[in-house]
Amino acid sequence: MRYTVILQKEDDGGYVVTVPVLPGCVSQGDTREEALRNIEEAIELYIEDMRAAGESVPVEDERAYVEVNTLVR
């Protein structure tokens, strides 16, 4: 399965990663690469728990997250 993740750099260093379609599925890492590896494992565990509980696993619709820069005056 493929999921969109949001990777955010923390002010004090490191990165936090969330998965919008999987509420509460969050991970972190000291580097981007570590954070992304960690979220892959978190997603796998999240889905395993859902299946064990008899819940259906969300399938993400095709989405695009686009960043827009604006000038505020």
Residue ranges with predicted function:
Residues 1-3, 37-73:
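Short, charged, surface-exposed hinge/linker loops at domain edges
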Residues 7-22:
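Short aromatic-glycine-(Arg/Gly/Cys) micro-motifs in beta-strand/loop hairpins
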Residues 14-15, 30, 55:
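Intrinsically disordered, low-complexity regions
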Residues 18, 36-37:
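Short, surface-exposed helix/turn micro-motifs that flank interaction/cofactor sites
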Residues 20, 24, 55-57:
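Flexible, active-site-adjacent loop/turn segments at secondary-structure boundaries
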Residues 23-32:
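A short, exposed loop/beta-hairpin motif centered on an aromatic-Gly-Thr core
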